[in-house]
């Protein structure tokens, strides 16, 4: 007996997409965002179903992973929100230290007078 060959080979649909990291630059209505990719290309991104169902907030300035089709590189699907770096927290703590130092200087000047 001869076996029928599958004329249409099944391909993994994920192979037709490329994943990039990008920065959300603008929030648009209906879960759409403008995202600047690492190669300075700006594309339109929409939230994937899992992110939408788990109520993950995506705001301007967030770093995201976005899946872009090889056939239409102007649109992509946001599949993951990357965790924030602690740079802002470090800046906040430096600012508070500066305030403490300036208050200490005022206290020493007042005690001298």
From Swiss-Prot:
Residues 8-83 form the S1-like domain. GO terms for cellular component: chloroplast; cytosol. It is found in: Plastid, Chloroplast. The keyword RNA-binding applies. Changing residue 53 to P: In strain: cv. CL2. Keywords: Chloroplast, Initiation factor, Plastid, Protein biosynthesis, RNA-binding, rRNA-binding. It holds the Pfam family eIF-1a. InterPro entries: NA-bd_OB-fold, RNA-binding_domain_S1_IF1, S1_domain, TIF_IF1. One of its GO terms (molecular function) is ribosome binding. The keyword Transmembrane helix does not apply. Residues 86-113 are annotated as: Disordered. Disulfide bonds: none annotated. Belongs to the IF-1 family. Component of the 30S ribosomal translation pre-initiation complex which assembles on the 30S ribosome in the order IF-2 and IF-3, IF-1 and N-formylmethionyl-tRNA(fMet); mRNA recruitment can occur at any time during PIC assembly. One of the essential components for the initiation of protein synthesis. Stabilizes the binding of IF-2 and IF-3 on the 30S subunit to which N-formylmethionyl-tRNA(fMet) subsequently binds. Helps modulate mRNA selection, yielding the 30S pre-initiation complex (PIC). Upon addition of the 50S ribosomal subunit IF-1, IF-2 and IF-3 are released leaving the mature 70S translation initiation complex. This is Translation initiation factor IF-1, chloroplastic. It comes from Hordeum vulgare. The lineage of its organism: Eukaryota, Viridiplantae, Streptophyta, Embryophyta, Tracheophyta. The gene is infA.
């Amino acid at each position: 007996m001869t076996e029928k060959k599958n004329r249409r080979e099944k391909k993994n649909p994920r192979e037709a997409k490329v994943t990039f990291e990008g920065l959300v630059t603008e929030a648009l209505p209906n879960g759409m965002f403008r995202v600047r990719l690492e190669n300075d290309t700006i594309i339109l991104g929409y939230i994937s179903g899992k992110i939408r169902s788990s109520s993950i907030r995506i705001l301007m300035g967030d770093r995201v992973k976005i899946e872009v089709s090889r056939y239409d590189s102007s649109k992509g699907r946001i599949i993951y929100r990357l965790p924030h770096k602690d740079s802002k927290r470090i800046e906040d703590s430096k600012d508070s230290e500066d305030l403490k130092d300036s208050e200490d200087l005022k206290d020493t000047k007042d005690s001298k007078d």
